[in-house]
Amino acid sequence: TGSERQEDEARCLELGASDFVPKPYNQRVVKARINSVIKLRESAAALSAIEYDDLTGLYTKSAFYYHAGILMRYKPDQSYVVVIADVKNFKLINNIYGIRVGDDILRYLAKIMSKALTDGLAARYSDDQFVMFTSIPKNDFEKYLENAVRYISENAPITNLLVKYGVYKDVDKSISISEICDRAIMAMKSIQLNYEKNIAYYDDQLGQQHIREVMMENDFENALRNEEFEVWFQPKYN
């Protein structure tokens, strides 16, 4: 009966079937539905290739931007934190230990980050950088991050693995996710040459310093373009 057929169709779809073709079969309809299912599967595979990094299984940078933006719009009252992790001297690690060990390090970091995040996002941001986006935990976040950094260092595939972290807490949701990440990167770069400090936090002072540096660079370029520099030679006497 019609009701039995509808029940069978509902049951098949609940069990995971992509489609249901009732009797009597129409050859053209069956072929068309099969082609539609194949195209959907191919589209899903293509989307997965774009969305996930092959090596680590984490989101790609573009997918991270998309999902983080949705998360902020979905929960606008939530406070969020972004953490950028940068593996120091990664090219040197590849040269010394080999690319396979370098890949193991990236997979190791990705695994740790995936386990640490229960309601957030993690992505491979670039070749040797990762990004995490999550709501700010109710417990002591600074202490939690310090313990996580210590654990990562102590259990790394190689000794003396150095990872620098830039943190932007309570992000400004009025700016784009790329700008949010830029602020975390700015914090990370502020300690790139400091071998006694592995974690840095973005603040307004750091932001103002960056603005001044950019303005100085722009002024310098304009001065060069306008030939405003003069070369003076100081005579040297014995």
Region locations from a protein language model:
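Active-site core of bacterial EAL-family cyclic-dinucleotide phosphodiesterase domains
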Residues: 67, 212-238
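Cyclic nucleotide signaling catalytic output domains
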Residues: 164-194, 200-215, 219, 223
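Conserved phosphotransfer active-site motifs of two-component signaling proteins
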Residues: 3-7, 136-137
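Signal-transducing coiled-coil linker helices
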Residues: 7-54, 61-72
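Conserved long alpha-helical elements within nucleotide-processing catalytic cores of c-di-GMP signaling
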Residues: 51-52, 57-81, 88-115, 123-132, ...
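Generic recognition of well-ordered alpha-helical segments
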Residues: 32, 66, 108-111, 147-150, ...
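GGDEF/GGEEF active-site signature
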Residues: 82, 107-172, 176
